[in-house]
Regions:
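Solvent-exposed soluble domains appended to multi-pass membrane proteins
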Residues: 237-248, 255-258, 263-568
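Transmembrane and membrane-interface helices of multi-pass
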Residues: 1-198
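Alpha-helix initiation and N-capping motif
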Residues: 100, 104, 205-206, 211, ...
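Membrane-proximal soluble helical/coiled-coil segments
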Residues: 111-112, 118-121, 125, 232-242, ...
């Protein structure tokens, strides 16, 4: 009974979960890949099996019936695997332990909207689920000969208590425990995890649950090798001593995250009947505006990571793929103790605020901005503008931003961090025909892909138009005002068969892997104002983690040593 319930069953769960996650077809090589990950990484497999065994013990004692315990674990595992398939197919990344923080009304509503992109892959997921259910039924039916019960009351109390204590220890993510598990079970270093190019690589190489746990371990901050506080302070002191004098005057500052703003005209195979960014192309010729390529951390989603980098100057390249600063870094202990543009502008007497059509619970947004110290936050339920297509229009958002700027004056400045949503995925059947200004002149793609390309292009056209409308409006302000607009990431444009003609475009698939990676993580950034900006730096590109610091250090403001160092 003990062998079946506490050894065989947990190992089956780990095995079947990895198989479920890896299957892209029927049978064949995938089956052996699962065995390969088990035998080449046996200790992680054994470690996760022990954790599931402890959970089985706890539930068995709770129900006093191992059959019920196994049913609960089978059902929970199936739900996890099913949702993982959905998330991976829609967003391109697997489920993580931190996704518990994603389960809130605003994020669930956004994912519900995205289900219009669900396609034929869901059939494969359903078939896998049915096979899983059949195997689960067989296990439960055979369990009548191996049902484990604890008739002794002391055992029913002591066993789950001890099991729970042991189970909790690996999930405290204490630094010493992390290092022990990494070194002795996974036999990996922090740098090896950081070298992983994609989060699903961990899941594939280590196994499903094994990779999920390793991903969580890798997200923990650790001091770099040979770290020295003295050396770090010397570097900061050098940056401060050599910091440049400001060349821009004190002004209102608007930093706008423009959803998926990049230049789709760089891609081959499709042509449009007009220039998609006529105003920004015009700005490029002006000597008082900055138009540059922006290197961003995410691809296809997780906009808040670009927002995080711009606001904090922290590069997420020091953390493994999949880390989300808003959901994993901020806590009550950091209130008043964090570095951000919000804090910098607060220290310079600005009113600071965040404005977006998204919801306040999305990625814990309202909580995070309270930790950052924003004076005011405005979310979608407070905005009165119109949607265009599925989401709140960029034109309406620009009007909302200008309404906030109208009340400013010299000595009464505002810093506004804003985020748009109109050009968020899904792109299929997003607009009514009457919503389009952009038409496709020629295309090599099928109807579905062409429809998505056109929807995305319309979003870029509208973002360019809305930015220019705001630019014209701020010319009427007496208060100096700077507007920074940046794209958060390239679009995630998946077809219903789970392929992406956008991602497979030759622009992203040259013979140079470095160029391919750079292009996948390149968007646009624009800086303009209602006064003449010194643009002598001639920026060709900038990383998102430097963008906020760059603007801050250009202005006539009191800047912390930290942000002087970031801009150095």
């Amino acid at each position: 009974k003990y062998v079946v319930n506490l050894i065989c069953f947990p190992m089956f769960i780990v095995f079947i979960s990895d198989l479920f996650n890896k299957i892209n077809g029927y049978g064949g090589k995938v089956y052996f890949d699962v065995f390969k990950s088990i035998f080449s990484n046996f200790l992680p497999f054994l470690f996760i099996s022990i954790l599931i065994s402890l959970l089985t013990l706890i539930l068995t004692a709770l129900f006093n019936d191992s059959k019920k315990a196994k049913i609960v674990i089978l059902v929970l595992t199936l739900i996890l695997l099913f949702v993982n398939d959905i998330k991976y197919s829609i967003m391109g990344i697997p489920i993580e332990l931190t996704d518990v923080g994603y389960l809130n009304p605003d994020n669930m509503n956004m994912m519900g909207t995205a289900t219009s992109s669900i396609g034929l892959w869901i059939i494969k997921t359903i078939i896998k689920s049915l096979i899983y259910i059949l195997l689960g039924i067989i296990i439960v039916l055979l369990d009548k000969h191996h049902n484990l019960k604890f008739n002794d009351l002391k055992k029913r109390i002591i066993i789950p208590f001890v099991s729970l204590v042991i189970l909790i220890i690996p999930f405290t993510f204490n630094t010493h425990i992390n290092n022990f598990i990494l070194k002795n079970i996974y036999r990996m270093s922090k740098s090896e995890i950081l070298a992983t190019s994609e989060i699903d690589q961990l899941y594939y190489e280590e196994g499903y649950f094994q990779g999920m746990y390793l991903d969580k371990l890798g997200n923990k901050f650790v001091l770099p090798d040979e770290y020295s506080r003295k050396t770090a302070q010397n570097a900061i002191n050098e940056a401060v001593s050599k910091s440049n004098k400001s060349s821009w005057k004190k002004a209102n500052v608007v930093i706008l995250l423009s959803e998926t703003f990049s230049d789709p005209q760089r891609l081959s195979g499709i042509e449009y009947d007009r220039e998609l960014m006529p105003n920004i192309k015009s700005y490029e010729k002006d000597d008082d505006k900055i138009v540059t390529d922006l290197l961003v951390n995410p691809y296809g989603g997780t906009s808040v990571n670009s927002e995080f980098e711009v606001l904090t100057g922290v590069s997420l390249s020091f953390l493994n793929v999949g880390y989300i600063g808003y959901t994993q870094y901020y806590n009550d202990n950091l209130k008043g103790k964090n570095q951000s543009l919000i804090n910098e502008f607060n220290n310079n007497g600005y009113e600071t605020m965040y404005l977006t059509p998204w919801g306040e619970t999305s990625y814990r947004s309202k909580y995070v901005y309270s930790i950052l110290g924003a004076d005011k936050t405005i979310y979608g339920n407070e905005l009165k503008g119109k949607n265009k297509g599925t989401y709140y229009s960029d034109e309406s958002l620009m009007n909302d931003i200008y309404d906030q700027l109208k009340t400013t004056s010299k000595g009464n400045y505002k810093f506004i961090m804003a985020a748009s949503g109109q050009n968020h995925f899904p792109y299929l059947d997003k607009y009514k025909e009457s919503d389009y200004d952009v038409n496709v002149k020629s295309t090599k793609y099928d109807k579905e892909a062409t429809n998505m390309f056109r929807s995305y292009a319309q979003g870029i056209y509208d973002a360019d138009k809305a930015l220019n409308q705001l630019y014209k409006k701020i010319q009427n302000l007496d208060t100096p005002t700077i507007v920074v607009m940046f794209g958060d990431h390239q679009p995630f444009m998946g077809k219903k068969d789970n392929t992406s003609d956008y991602l497979q475009n030759s622009y992203f698939n040259t013979n140079d892997e470095i160029i391919n990676d750079i292009r996948l993580h390149t968007t646009k950034a624009v800086i303009l104002a209602n006064f003449k900006l010194d643009t002598s730096d001639n920026l060709e590109f900038i990383n998102s983690s430097y963008l906020g610091a760059y603007v801050l250090n250009k202005m006539d403001l009191k800047v912390s040593d930290y942000f002087k160092f970031v801009d150095y």
